[in-house]
Regions:
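Extracellular/virion structural assembly segments
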Residues: 580-673
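Conserved blade-ending motifs and adjacent loop-strand segments that build the rim/top face
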Residues: 360-376, 408-440
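Blade-level signature of beta-propeller repeat domains, shared across WD40, Kelch, NHL, RCC1
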Residues: 430-482
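Non-cytosolic beta-sandwich-type ligand-binding/adhesion modules
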Residues: 14, 23, 50-52, 63, ...
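Exposed aromatic-hydrophobic patches
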Residues: 262-263, 308, 430-435, 538-547
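Short loop/turn motifs that cap or connect beta-strands within the blades
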Residues: 150-158, 207-214, 262-266, 309-311, ...
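Conserved loop/turn at the beginning of each blade in beta-propeller domains
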Residues: 105-106, 158-161, 219-222, 267-270, ...
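N-terminal beta-propeller domains
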Residues: 2-156, 163-168, 173, 177-206, ...
């Protein structure tokens, strides 16, 4: 008696032996269009992460994007400097000395401008004896890294607070805006202007503004009620008259000495940012952001033009500047939104109109939880757009990021945002940044961290535009972390042995000096399991003595360190190679001959019925249950009839013509998964 097998809930008698074999798992059952890496299923594979200079925000490389070289240049999170070809530790922040005035308390710096070779900041504070509000102008001295000189811009005539709003240059004068009673009246909700030829002595305009905001000044408050824009020899004050829900513009043609109210009125709230850019006619105009949109003021026609409609949010436009993106076709306007995006608006001319793109860090996978928020301030350079971000809640840390413009190249691509600095105290924003080499020629990225409502700390990053490869002396943070994106190397279903990593790094020392500690996590786990240390003489580390660990995907974390006593040193690194081997699941196949003639006798079933059952199993779309030993393991297989045999074992080519003589049927069964 022969062997019996079960197929599709039917029992069949096998004539002779069952041939068992392995099925090639990389046959066309895997879709080539998905770009799975079938051509690299060798005994050992490796994947190279190049220098991560396409920026943060990529949590995981999609399986079908594994061969996209841009994906491997991204990182999920970073607190090292990834802007250059070789990654290094982030620049060490250094402290600036805040201004002091006897008998007075200075709260914070609101904004700044370069004037006659110096960087001038506008500060607000109070008189200690009676809490009367004060506004000050101070200039930055590079040799002492301190805010000094200057004079008092405005002083409250009673005991009420004042708020500094904005400072600008027109011709040979500084002009400042102040919120509060600063002219002998008790009008605490009025915006007033001041002007100065030297920053030390400040004067009241002969014809003053009269913009009533409806919001009283508060100590250290953040009211966005007035901004200044200079165009040629004219300066415009854009004032939020919140008590009547209107925005009005005042103009001075004589460097802030006298102001004239323009007749056009815009219904809206808040003036969060303002710059000089193009209106819809292609003319340079005051352009500003309100709670619900970006508007241009057509100075010739005395009308407002809507450039970009925004979802209403009080924090729209806090970051608002003009920058020449190296990847954009023209100079662009950048406007942050309250939900964390950055809108790039590019005017191309009256015939071409404008292009609007989202280039912010919220695209792709966004940002890790601790870095989420919205833009607070912006400052552009020839190569990067720097902006402060986040720090608006108890679990959020403010950071400074640098956008290199790459996100402009492909719509919905969030690449190009790089880490510069983090405020280590949560819920403390960075509310001012400025890039300047005044007054000593040394370029600094200045910024201010809020330490409380009425206290702050100004700091700077030295030489923020210079690559470490230049050889210029720089100071670096003591440590930093970067998380590479998680990847399954293009085969998400199959397990791999993750064997080791090799890091193309230099300027390494021992674990007391410059080195990287590598951690990993598999299958979505936090990358916190130790891989080993990359040190001088050891650039490759392995897992389980070279046997590797199993998982479908892996994520690498690099913990960078330098000598605690020497801030001039940093590891430098480029490509990270991950060695692995994908283990493709074995698939089984069976070939055998069903003895339909003897089955018909033993089961008293017509041969035609047995054959019909086999044809049904072949035709069924769902896989068929199969046991090569009755009661044994169940496999799910695809069924193929290979041919028919007569009673003499000869092949019958046409089944229908030879049905009475069919004695056996040849079958092939194969697993698919």
């Amino acid at each position: 008696m022969g062997t019996w097998v079960d197929l599709n809930s039917q029992r069949y008698l096998v004539r002779g032996d069952i041939q068992r074999y392995k099925v090639d798992p990389t046959a066309p059952v895997v879709r080539q269009s998905g770009r799975q890496r079938l051509d690299s299923l060798t005994s050992r594979q490796s994947f190279i992460f190049p220098a991560p200079n396409f920026g943060i925000g990529m949590r995981r490389i999609r399986s079908d994007k594994i061969d996209d070289p841009m994906m491997a240049r991204r990182s999920w999170d970073s607190e090292i400097d990834t802007r250059f070809e070789d990654a290094v530790l982030a620049i060490l922040n250094e402290d600036s000395t805040e201004p002091t005035t006897s008998g007075q308390t200075i709260y914070r710096l609101v904004d700044s401008v370069e004037f006659k070779g110096d960087l001038w900041g506008l500060f607000d504070g109070k008189q200690d004896s009676d809490n009367a509000g004060q506004v000050y102008a101070r200039k930055y001295t590079g040799s002492s890294t301190a805010w000094t000189g200057g004079g008092g811009v405005a002083s409250d005539q009673d005991t009420n607070p004042l708020q500094a709003l904005d400072i600008a240059v027109v011709g040979d004068a500084l002009v400042a805006l102040v919120l509060g009673s600063s002219d002998g009246s008790d009008e605490r909700d009025y915006v007033r202007a001041r002007y100065s030829a030297d920053g030390a002595s400040w004067s009241t305009p002969s014809t003053q503004m009269g913009g009533q905001t409806g919001t009283n000044a508060t100590a250290g408050g953040d009211t966005q009620d007035g901004k200044l824009v200079t165009i040629g020899g004219d300066i415009y004050g854009i004032i939020n008259e919140a008590d009547v829900g209107q925005i009005r513009i005042w103009k001075s043609t004589n460097e802030g000495v006298a102001w004239t109210q323009q007749s056009a009125v815009l219904t809206g709230e808040r003036v969060n940012g303002a710059v000089a850019y193009f209106d819809l006619n292609g003319d340079e105009a005051p352009v500003f952001c309100t709670r619900d949109g970006v508007y241009a003021y057509d100075t010739s026609a005395n009308v407002y033009q809507l450039l970009v409609r925004l979802i209403p949010d009080d924090n729209n436009g806090l970051g608002f500047t003009v920058w020449s993106n190296p990847f954009a076709p023209a100079q662009s306007l950048y406007c942050s939104t309250g939900d964390g995006d950055i809108i790039e608006y590019t005017w191309l001319g009256t015939s071409s109109g404008s292009i609007i793109r989202n280039v912010g860090p919220t695209k792709d996978d966004g940002l890790p939880t601790a870095k989420q928020g919205y833009v607070q301030h912006m400052a552009g350079s020839t190569r990067w757009l720097f902006y402060s971000y986040g720090g608006h809640a108890g679990s959020k840390n403010a950071t400074i990021l640098a956008f290199d413009g790459k996100g402009h190249k492909i719509e919905f691509d969030g690449s190009g945002n790089h880490f510069m600095h983090k405020n280590t105290t949560a819920n403390r924003r960075i509310d001012w940044i400025a890039l300047s080499n005044a007054d000593d020629g040394n370029l600094r990225l200045h910024f201010q961290e809020r330490t409380a409502t009425t206290t702050s700390d100004t700091k700077f990053l030295a030489e923020p535009l210079v690559s470490p490869a230049s050889g210029i002396a720089k100071k670096y943070m003591a440590s930093g972390v970067i998380d590479r994106p998680e990847t399954d190397f293009g085969l998400p279903r199959d397990d791999a042995a993750f064997i080791g990593v090799f890091y193309q790094a230099r300027d390494l020392g021992t674990t007391d000096e410059e080195y990287m500690n590598i951690d990993y996590g598999v299958n979505g786990a936090t990358p916190s399991t130790d891989f080993g240390n990359i040190i001088s003489g050891t650039q490759e580390v392995t897992l389980a003595s070279g046997a590797g660990v199993s998982g479908k995907s892996i994520q690498i974390r690099e913990n960078w360190n330098r000598s605690s006593g020497d801030s001039s040193k940093t590891p430098q690194a480029n490509s990270l190679e991950v060695m692995y081997r994908k283990k493709i699941a074995s698939l089984r196949g069976w070939r055998f001959t069903v003895d339909v003639a003897n089955m018909a006798v033993e089961q008293q079933t017509p041969i035609a019925t047995v054959i019909a059952n086999l044809e049904t199993a072949e035709a069924n779309v769902p896989l068929q249950a199969f046991e090569d030993l009755p009661g044994g393991t169940t496999y799910y297989v695809d069924v193929t009839i290979l041919g028919w045999l007569d009673e003499h074992g000869r092949s019958v080519s046409v089944y229908e013509d030879a049905e009475p003589n069919i004695s056996a049927v040849q079958l092939q069964l194969q697993e698919v998964l």
